[in-house]
Amino acid sequence: MIEKQNGRLLVSAPLIMANARGLLDAGRSALQRGEVIFDFSAVNEADSSAIAVMLGWLRAAVPAQASVKFAHIPAGVRSLAELYGVTDLLPLA
């Protein structure tokens, strides 16, 4: 689902409702102090649950003293973020 690669956390599982809980938990477990970049370049499918997962990682980053950024967000997820008015909450790498 998520693996460390080249200093980033590469998300490889589809960002869909069926995987949301597993991705949320895997991302939380991977958080560490400092900058953490979630890279979505290997994601080939995503739905609205992706926004919830990303916001969950941002919330979990605070107690972990991590600074989360997102790279290669799928176009559909970006569109949903704009629709929901949360684009400014998703820091880009």
Provide a role label for each language-model segment.
Residues 1-49, 56-93:
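STAS-like cytosolic regulatory interaction modules
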